[in-house]
From Swiss-Prot:
Residues 34-72, 201-283 are annotated as: Disordered. This is Pancreas/duodenum homeobox protein 1. One of its GO terms (cellular component) is nucleus. SMART domains: HOX. It comes from Pan paniscus (Pygmy chimpanzee). The modification Phosphoserine is found at residue 268. Belongs to the Antp homeobox family. IPF1/XlHbox-8 subfamily.
Length: 283
């Protein structure tokens, strides 16, 4: 056998192998029945993942040898299983884009058991009065907030605390423990009560001091006395006013000798009206 015959034998063997590969693919019965596909059109098969490699194979193959044919993907049992489930998923309704269904406003959907009420702190003027009345779970009071609630002391408790504060402005630890047990309170309550009571007492004391100073400093000033009268001795040295008859008081000579007569009186006073002497008759 020469070389030409060997070439033709190898070419014929290669053609037979390619023809075997080009043969129809066997049909598989693993796919679903045809009745399930009635009225449903499956999507087209995806493109080949390696189109460049297939084109290179077509270009590099001999002219008398056709390229390898890829069997249809629909005959693959895995692809048929995918087609069986894909239409069912496409038939499901699409979920809404937002958290609320179409035609519904955001404020309409609410929990049926939740009562819609305004803010609790807007319903009462007291800071902590709403905590005991509010039953909503969303606005339930926290454990930390319960510590800040105001303690309501009874009259008996206030009486004992006031009596203790009257004797001691600052309470000691043993006495505080004793009062807490006796009044059914905590040490913290008694400590805070004494702190507040001391602040109130200090404010009252400051107010009293400020009021006394204002009253003492704001009094009406007494009128000043005459400059001529400065002591009680000068008042005694001054003579009484003269009688209407023009007689000189007896204290005038004494005052004249001492040189302390007032300017209105002279040293030798003369009566205002002196009777004329009668001439003596000759005997």
């Amino acid at each position: 056998m020469n070389g030409e015959e060997q070439y033709y034998a190898a070419t014929q063997l290669y053609k037979d192998s390619c023809a075997f590969q080009r043969g129809p693919a066997p049909e598989f019965s693993a796919g679903p029945p045809a009745c399930l596909y009635m009225g449903r059109q499956p999507p087209p098969p995806p493109p080949h993942p390696f189109p460049g490699a297939l084109g290179a194979l077509e270009q590099g193959s001999p002219p008398d040898i056709s390229p390898y044919e890829v069997p249809p993907l629909a005959d693959d049992p895995a692809v048929a299983h995918l087609h069986h489930h894909l239409p069912a998923q496409l038939a499901l309704p699409h979920p809404p884009a937002g958290p609320f269904p179409e035609g519904a406003e955001p404020g309409v959907l609410e929990e049926p058991n939740r009562v819609q009420l305004p803010f609790p702190w807007m319903k009462s003027t007291k800071a902590h009065x709403w905590k005991g009345q509010w039953a909503g779970g969303a606005y339930a009071a926290e454990p930390e907030e319960n510590k800040r609630t105001r303690t309501a002391y009874t009259r008996a408790q206030l009486l004992e605390l006031e009596k203790e504060f009257l004797f001691n402005k600052y309470i000691s630890r043993p006495r505080r423990v004793e009062l807490a047990v006796m009044l059914n309170l905590t040490e913290r309550h008694i400590k805070i009560w004494f702190q507040n009571r001391r602040m109130k007492w200090k404010k009252e004391e400051d107010k009293k001091r400020g009021g006394g100073t204002a009253v003492g400093g704001g009094g009406v000033a007494e009128p000043e006395q005459d400059c001529a009268v400065t002591s009680g001795e000068e008042l005694l040295a001054l003579p009484p006013p003269p009688p209407p008859g023009g007689a000189v008081p007896p204290a005038a000579p004494v005052a004249a000798r001492e040189g302390r007569l007032p300017p209105g009186l002279s040293a030798s006073p003369q009566p205002s009206s002196v009777a004329p002497r009668r001439p003596q008759e000759p005997r």
